[in-house]
Regions:
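Active-site loop segments of alpha/beta catalytic cores
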Residues: 3-11, 26, 35
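Solenoid-like repeat scaffolds
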Residues: 5-9, 40-50
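Short intrinsically disordered, low-complexity coil segments enriched in acidic
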Residues: 1-7, 54-57
Length: 145
């Protein structure tokens, strides 16, 4: 790099998500869930990636890695809950504030990622996201994105 820029670990975390949802579907444990939690919290705290500012998959990548690692280890539970609450407080208003004509809604794949993120948040942190009916966690039924 040489120009003072630093590389983010986030792309690697996002790639890991694709392995993790298959591990969950196969009911297999993650390796090193505590390290994944530390990485997720670090990405969030350092703002390594603009989470909660787009309709897409980055958000589900981060939320899923954090929540499912937390289910397996309980490591830094309070910090995880605080990060999820902070993220939801930013992400839900962002999505709610988008105009229906926004191009983000034209891409069904990206919209699916956003909906998966909301469903994961709703399950992992009850009360953060309220809907008339619970959102369905598609990744628990079919591990494919």
């Amino acid at each position: 790099m040489g120009n003072g820029e630093t590389l983010s670990i986030f792309p690697h975390l996002a790639g890991t998500f694709h392995y993790f949802f298959n591990h969950v579907y196969a009911r297999r444990p993650f390796r090193y869930p505590e390290a994944v939690i530390d990485t997720c919290l670090g990405v969030f705290d350092r703002q390594d990636y603009p989470l909660g500012a787009q309709v897409g998959f980055a958000e589900i990548d981060w939320v899923f890695c954090l929540t499912r690692s937390l289910q397996q280890s309980g490591h830094r539970f309070g910090a995880c809950r605080a990060a999820l609450a902070s993220f939801a407080a930013r992400y839900v208003p962002f999505l709610s504030g988008l105009d229906a004509s926004n191009q983000a809604f034209d891409d069904l794949h990206q919209l699916f990622g956003a909906m998966c993120c909301l469903a994961e948040l709703q399950q992992a942190a009850p009360g953060l996201i309220r809907t008339e009916q619970p959102l369905k966690l598609v990744l628990d039924r079919r591990p494919f994105i």
